[in-house]
Amino acid sequence: IDGFIKQISTHSKMHIDRKEDSPVDSSKDYIAIIGMSGRFADARNIEEFYYNLRNGKDSVREIPKERWDWSECFSTKENLKPGETYSRWGGYMDDIDKFDPLFFNISNQEAKGLDPQERIFLETAVETLEDSGYTPKSLDKEKLGVFVGVMWGQYQLYGADDAETGSSYASVANRVSYFLNAHGPSLAVDTMCSSSLTSLHLACKSILNGESSIALAGGVNITVHPNKYLYLSKTGFASTDGKCRSFGIDGDGYVPGDGS
């Protein structure tokens, strides 16, 4: 989920009982989330995601054919061989190949080489901007920082011999900064499952220490290559039945899920 974060000074709006010589603890300054956007499996936006949560909808399914044919490398955990996986489930977003490059001043040729994670985070970043009530022009006087948690950049494996195919984690954040003409920090972080939370933490710190006056923080994770499942099966991280049972006695692994 992408969120715009803005520091709000409240000292002039409320009375605080303290001694005259008491120092002001800037770490207690309030930071507000003023815009939000998100895409997930079976949810094109935050509203649909909330609806699914309220209704207990299970959005995990077998790997769709549009990604790859899981049956070509599927086995059981007991009989697993190199190049095989015992997991065939995940939470998958639809239409990850749909992208309007000209809106972002990107040529069609360049867009083909962009990792879907980069494309979709760019789209959700702009949606967050709209939700917050800002326009790119209104950010000119702000020090906008962009912080994104991202991992599993495997799109380039489909064109490893093509120099025009591929992406770096940094470009996921940098492209947003470039499009919005942002002048604050622009960085990508990979701390595995905590990547998005880490980016939010860094965004808050950047605001509090004055590096940014406003920040966009979030994460993106989209599974596009079977190599991820091969690794998760080899290391035993993947669930054997497509169910996550966090801290449960029957839990035996996790299920990958798309999101931005």
Feature map (PLM): residue ranges:
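Structural beta-strand/beta-sheet cores of well-ordered domains, especially the beta-sheet scaffolds
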Residues: 29-32, 49, 56-59, 89, ...
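4′-phosphopantetheine-dependent carrier domains
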Residues: 1-30, 34-40, 44-48, 97, ...
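Active-site-proximal gating segment of KS-fold condensing enzymes and close homologs
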Residues: 81-84, 108-116, 139-141, 146-189, ...
